[in-house]
Regions:
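Aromatic- and carboxylate-enriched substrate-binding clefts and catalytic-loop regions
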Residues: 67-217
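Short intrinsically disordered, low-complexity coil segments enriched in acidic
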Residues: 1-5, 214-219
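Carbohydrate-recognition beta-sandwich/jelly-roll modules
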Residues: 1-69, 100-102
Length: 219
């Protein structure tokens, strides 16, 4: 026989009721802070930027009388190929707390990009290897791939200690003044020949992994 596909039919007397019934199954989303409904500005696809660049972007919006509520720091707030280590590139951002405080004083919410893939150049790589915080191969070795960064490992959020470890990095950013987190990726997850800490089915984890990442960032 070929592959199977499961369907879930969720009904209701109206579209509103269908949505209520659907979220009964998936969970009810929390209402985001009001600021997040405003205009966002991102450094996405800007591969080299520093504090001066960020300030020029924000000043440019003000000069054009375009109201701005959120500013997002994409990949390169960290050093290239050290994703994710939760460490600012101090060559480009010498004093991150002071910068964040200055930007917040302008009424901006501040967002940083992260992902659960740990580069071999990241300071977190050796820690995760030693403590068993990464998804593993069936032989017990750490699963590594070159799909995003050379030899990267993937955080195993089914391990409670690994989840706490990753969440500590998120908390560090928030305590510094970051008010939102972009939890990127999570979709490039191996669906066979890997082992999770809690024995989860890798095939099913393909869809559940991103929820685990999001939940961890809320810890």
């Amino acid at each position: 026989p070929g592959e199977e596909l499961d369907y879930f039919l969720i009904g209701g007397e109206s579209l509103e009721e269908v949505l209520v019934n659907y979220t009964d199954l998936t969970g009810k989303p929390a209402l985001p802070p009001a600021k997040t409904f405003g205009l966002w500005l991102s450094t996405s696809f800007t591969t080299t930027y520093d504090e001066e660049t960020v300030t020029s972007f924000i000043d440019g919006m003000a000069e054009r009388d375009i109201p701005l509520q959120m500013f997002h720091f994409d990949c390169f707030w960290m050093k290239e190929y050290q994703w994710t280590d939760f460490e600012w590139d101090l060559d480009q951002f010498p004093d991150p707390p002071a910068m964040l405080k200055r930007l917040a004083s302008r009424g901006l919410g501040l967002c940083c990009w992260i992902n659960p893939y740990i580069s071999q150049k990241s300071k977190l790589f050796d820690i995760g290897m030693e403590k068993g915080y990464f998804i593993k191969n069936p032989d017990g070795s750490v699963f590594q791939t070159d799909l995003w960064q050379p030899g990267m490992a993937i955080v195993d959020f089914t391990n409670p200690e690994a989840a706490k470890w990753f969440a500590a990095g998120v908390r560090k950013l928030c305590e510094m003044g970051v008010t939102a987190i972009k939890t990127d990726f999570g979709e490039r997850i191996p669906t066979k020949d890997v082992v999770y800490y809690d024995g989860s089915d890798p095939y099913k984890m393909h869809n559940y992994y991103t929820r685990s990442e999001e939940h961890t960032s809320e810890l």
